[in-house]
Amino acid sequence: MERRSIAFSPPDITELEIQEVAEALRSGWITTGPRTKQLEKNLAEYCHTNKVVCLNSATAAEELNLRVLGIGEGDEVLVPAYTYTASASAAIHCGATVKFIDSQKDSVEMDYDAMEAAITEKTKAVITVDLGGIPCDYDRIYQAVERKKALFQPANSIQKAIGRVIVVADCAHALGAERLGKMAGEIADFTSFSFHAVKNFTTAEGGASTWKSIPGIDDEELYHQYQLLSLHGQSKDALAKTKLGAWEYDIIGPWYKCNMTDIMAAIGLKQLERYPGLLARRKEIIGRYDAALKPLGIQVLDHYNAEHTSSGHLYITRVPGITEEQRQEIIVKMAEAGIACNVHFKPLPMMTAYKALGWDIKDFPHAYDYYHNLITLPLHTKLTDEDVEYVMENYKKIVKEYI
């Protein structure tokens, strides 16, 4: 078999995106402007929500979700131990205390019984993570927060309107995923998306916030609050100041700078037009991988079933019986064949920052067990059928030495 070079997750950029970016550059308007506003509108239609706010990262989106909710010092936020750092660091930025929750056995999802048991009078939010693009069991999550609503102590009008622990979804991987007929974005109370270069849908860097409409809370006012938080607390953005005589603005609060630019939005506008085809191609590749690898006893995620349709972001495999050292050997052998692999994720209690906060991976045995024999294969829309075959054949050959 002729050696190939298979990147892990390159962006899928075509002349459509390049031309739209060039038009944005020629327009003379390159910061937050008409293209950003159009992308927000298009994404809201796609997610079946009233409003979307485009920002410069998913981390900023999650942090602003928590800040809009008024979550801060003295509050607790429940976070899966098995996730990327942004899921937890956004809450820490706000001054809240993170409480990690172990995974279910042989699953990337939180142990929802443990999550429910962890809810106290201080708990304000639970961060759910649709890892790999697969929606969590939101029925169980909402059941848990409803059963514990008597403990909830609202600190402001929006918390009072929701009346229970708030479900804040980290959908960094999950734009386009569906669960029981609902799109990611309209399932959780608040949702953040990532448009980073490695994601299915990219604006190079970037992200977005959206939310379900809340009775008694005005969506336009919420949107305005995000605008203030994302642009120094400035009462007008640059586009609004272009109106005749409209130079003057106020600073409402000493806040943050995390707005999206029209150059980034230009990429996103064309990506969204192409997105149904990109998702379909990912589903094809996952189907081929599943057919080749499951008969060997390799464990994989269930991306598509009667309850949910994944966005197909990650192809996570688990090789039964291998050690961390053997996992590394397999990754190196794949790299020697020209195939880049990865691991998603090293549980946060294993990381220096979180160990320093007192967390110990020994308290999260299911998260560690899932991680220690996990290998993520390349899954992206730049893969040809021949590339997919090359990845499958090499992986089967290498893994057979260890099974």
Question: What role is predicted for each listed range?
Answer:
Residues K37-K41, T49-N50, A125-V129, I134, ...:
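PLP-dependent aminotransferase class I/II
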Residues S89-A91, M183, I263:
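Hydrophobic/aromatic ligand-binding patch that stacks against planar heteroaromatic rings
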Residues W29-E76, A90-I92, F100-I101, K149-A155, ...:
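Phosphate-binding glycine-rich loop
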Residues D106-T203, S209, S213-P215:
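Active-site phosphate-binding strand-loop segment of PLP-dependent enzymes
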